[in-house]
Every structure is written in C-alpha cells, then in structure tokens.
Amino acid sequence: MIQKLKDFKLTPENTYYATGKRKEAVARVWLLRDRPNTFIVGSDKTNKEYDLREYVQRETLYNKIMYPFKVTGHEGKFGIYATVRGGGISAQAEAIMYGVAKALLQHNPDLRPTLKKAGLLTRDAREKERKKYGQMGARAKYRWSKR
C-alpha cells in the first residue's frame, strides 16, 4: 500500500520545496526529511498518486531521479513527493531530478559545487522546434521537383 500525501504534514520545518522543468514537463518536488525512502509521484493528469518505481517503470529513469542523492551521499535520508504535469515520462523524470537537486541545495547550500560538477544545476533548455509553414515539419521539407 503506497502512502498518500494526506498522510504527511508538509511544513517548512520538515520539507524542502523546488520546481524542475524539462521540455514541456513541470515537476513540483518536496523532499520529506521525516520520511526517508518514501517516494510518491502525483500526476496532475490523472489526479492519482503512485509509488515512484511504479510510475517511471524503467530502471534507468529511476536511477536518474536518484542520482542527486547518490552524488551528494544523501541516499536514504529523504523521501520525495512530486507532482508532475505535461511532457512524457522521460521528461518528467528529468524534471523531478532537477527539482530534487534544487531542493537538496535548499537543504545544504554547501552542496552547490558537488551538484554543479555533476551537471545537476544546469537546466536542459532544449525545446521542440516549431513546425514551419510550407514544410512537413520543423526541418523536413515536402518533396520538390524542378520539372
């Protein structure tokens, strides 16, 4: 049975909050100090809460989310509650990872050099390129024949 957000009392004393973005995905992340190894993801699309492993399913995405804890040596010290909106599962996982890194920075500003060296404080700003008129897509063109 997964724990729900209503089971926790979120206060500034026991949580650290940050947002992470990647492509169209936006993640609001709370690190739960009193609840280590509790990982909940709430989807704004379905209005449900899931266990993190159940939500991302792929081990690589789960490891990506946990990477900030691994780099800083804070494995097993915090729980995660995150709400995600928009984008695909991979972009949502990267948004959560970025949010976790920023929340860890709130917990301890001395972690900045470690997180920066691991590349966790730089937002990946690549976005989808827009479709151009007179073309099939952003770069793909319709077939053209001179004669």
Swiss-Prot record:
Gene Ontology CC: one annotated term: cytosolic small ribosomal subunit
Pfam name, any one: Ribosomal_S9
Gene Ontology MF term list: RNA binding; structural constituent of ribosome
Record-linked SUPFAM superfamilies: Ribosomal protein S5 domain 2-like
Family recorded in the similarity comment: Belongs to the universal ribosomal protein uS9 family.
Species per Swiss-Prot/TrEMBL record: Aquifex aeolicus (strain VF5)
Name recorded for this polypeptide: Small ribosomal subunit protein uS9
One GO biological process term: translation
Domain of life: Bacteria
NCBIfam families in alphabetical order: PRK00132.1 (NF001099)
Region (Disordered): 128-147
Record flagged with keyword Ribosomal protein: yes
Entry keyword annotation includes Ribosomal protein: yes
